[in-house]
Amino acid sequence: MSRVAKKPISVPKGVEVSVRSDMLTVKGVKGVLTFPKSDNVNVVVDGDILTLSANDPSHVSLAGTVRAILSNMIKGVSIGFERKLELVGVGYRASMQGENLNLSLGFSHPLVFVPPEGITLLTPSQTEVVVQGIDKQRVGEVAAKIRSFRPPEPYKGKGLKYAAEAIMRKEAKKA
């Protein structure tokens, strides 16, 4: 069996997990997340411990995937997720206008990004953007979408980058 699927998940206080025949629902302080349940994976709730098992050996990897998703759902509704982006470059600025994010990235026009439902955007400074939410996948998707407006270039490192991202720098051509 998958080593990931063998490990039980502990459910913290304030988080409620319900298992139906076709849906897994996780309710917590920050919100509610649902995930479609596969018939090939058994989910057993025993007090504050969740255990998963596969119906047959060919679905062991699926059980590991479902376990990882469930673990992220539990963490999301209790703590939440965030990704930080940094703007590097002269004149590159970020600001909030209501719920929308305004980005000045050296184009002839400012970019306006409308966040999807369930995602919160913050700008602690003009060169930082913080993406927050309860769904890890959506937080990552939104952060990647914002980064795609001006990815960092390898010569000067200008652009939008993740806070912990190391940019591989290239040396300029010597004449």
Swiss-Prot record:
One GO MF term attached to the UniProt entry = rRNA binding
Q: What does this protein do?
A: This protein binds to the 23S rRNA, and is important in its secondary structure. It is located near the subunit interface in the base of the L7/L12 stalk, and near the tRNA binding site of the peptidyltransferase center.
Entry protein name: Large ribosomal subunit protein uL6
**Cited Pfam families:** Ribosomal_L6
Q: Which organism is it from?
A: Xylella fastidiosa (strain 9a5c)
Asked whether the UniProt record includes Nucleotide-binding among its keywords, one would answer no
Which Gene3D superfamilies has this protein been placed in? Ribosomal protein L6, alpha-beta domain
One biological-process term from Gene Ontology? cytoplasmic translation
Q: Which UniProt keywords apply?
A: Ribonucleoprotein, Ribosomal protein, RNA-binding, rRNA-binding
* Annotated SUPFAM superfamilies: Ribosomal protein L6 (SSF56053)
* Subunit composition and interactions: Part of the 50S ribosomal subunit.
Its GO CC terms? cytosolic large ribosomal subunit
Keyword Ribosomal protein included in the entry's annotation: yes
The family classification in the record reads:
Belongs to the universal ribosomal protein uL6 family.
Q: Which domain of life is it from?
A: Bacteria
